Amino acid sequence: MKLGIVGLPNVGKSTLFNSLTKAGALSANYPFATIDPNVGIVSVPDERIVKLGELYHTKKVTPATIEFVDIAGLVKGASKGEGLGNQFLANIREVDAIVHVVRCFEDTNIIHVDGSIDPARDIETINLELIFSDIEILDRRIAKIAKQARMDKTLAKELELVEAVKKHLEDGKMARTFEVPDDDDAQIWFKGYNLLTAKPTIYAANVAEDDLADDGASNPHVAKVREMAKEEGAEVFVICAQIEQELAELDEDEKKEYLEDLGVESSGLDKLVAASYSLLGLISFLTAGEDECRAWTIKKGTKAPQAAGKIQTDFERGFIKAEVVNYQDLLDNGSLSAAREKGIVGMEGKDYVVKDGDVILFRFNV
C-alpha cells in the first residue's frame, strides 16, 4: 500500500512525513523544500504479531508495512506547470490513497504561501489542481474515442461515461463522489482512468498542541475541514505534526508518559496508520512459527488461495487447504496443538474468505 502526503508549502507536510518515517527528509521554511518525493516504509502497529512472537519464541517478528511518499508542495497553477507542476501530479497518480495535510494552526514564524490561514481556500487550491489534471486525462480519452464511438456501441457507452464524469468535475466535485453505473464495463473504465480525485483521501488537520486534547473540537479551522470533507466523501484526522516529530525521537515509555501529559491516549501516527488501513478496506492475516511471525496485508473479501499468493505466488497455484485459527483463540489456548484438540482450528478450502486476525497455516503442493 502506498499513500501520498500532499499539501501546500509550509503546512507541516514534510514534518509529518519525518514523524512517520524518522527519515529526516529536508524540511525548511520555504516553498518546495521537498524537490523529489521522499519515500519511507512505515510499520503498521499491531500488538497481535508481537504477542504471537512471544508465544512462539520466534527469531523474527515482521509487521505489515505502509509506504508513504512525501510529494512536493503544490501551488495554484500546478496543473498548468506552475511551481513544480505536472511532474508531481504524476507522483500522486501512483499512490493508492492521499493524505492531504491542511494547516489549522496559527504561527507568525512560519509563513503561509498565501499570507493567511484559511483551510477552505487551501483545500480548494489543491483540489482544483487535481480536478484540472483529471479533466485533462478525460479530454485525452474523449479525443481518442469520440470518432470511433459513432460506429461502436461499446465506445459510445464509454464516451457517455467519460463526459458524465467530466461534467461532474467541471461542477467542482471530486470523482470519488461520482455514482458510477452498476455494470462491469463502467466500473472497469472508471477505475482505468486512475483519476486523482477518485482516490480515497484523509485530511490531516494539522493543529497546535493545545488543540489535541479535544481533537480539534474548539478549533474553527478544523470545523471547516470537517464540513468540506463530509461534502466530498473524505475522512478527517486531527494531528499535531510538530508533537509527532518530537514523539518519534522518544522510546515507548517516554512516549506514553508524554501522551498522558498531553491528555491524549495514543499517538496520532498510530491512529493515522489505522485510519489508512480502514480507508482502503485492508485487513491483516498472520503467519506464525519459530523462524518468523509475520503480518500480511490483504483487501477485505480476499479468499484463502489469494492470501497464500501474498506470501509466494506458488502457494496460490498449488493451494490445497488452509488451517485457520482466530488469533485470540490461539493465544488463549497457548499453542496450535492445544487449539486443535479443542476443535477450534478450521481446515478451510479455496472459497474461505480470510478474516482480520486469522492465523493461517497453508497446505499446498507445487
Give residue ranges: language-model regions.
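Conserved G1/Walker A P-loop phosphate-binding module
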Residues: 1-111, 139-140, 145
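Glycine-rich, flexible loop/turn motifs
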Residues: 23-31, 38-40, 48-51, 80, ...
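Conserved Switch II/interswitch segment of TRAFAC-class P-loop GTPases
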Residues: 40-45, 72-82, 93-155, 168-182, ...
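Amphipathic alpha-helical transducer elements in NTP-driven molecular machines
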Residues: 32, 46-49, 62-68, 82-96, ...
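Flexible interhelical turns and helix-capping residues at alpha-helix boundaries
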Residues: 9, 131-134, 194
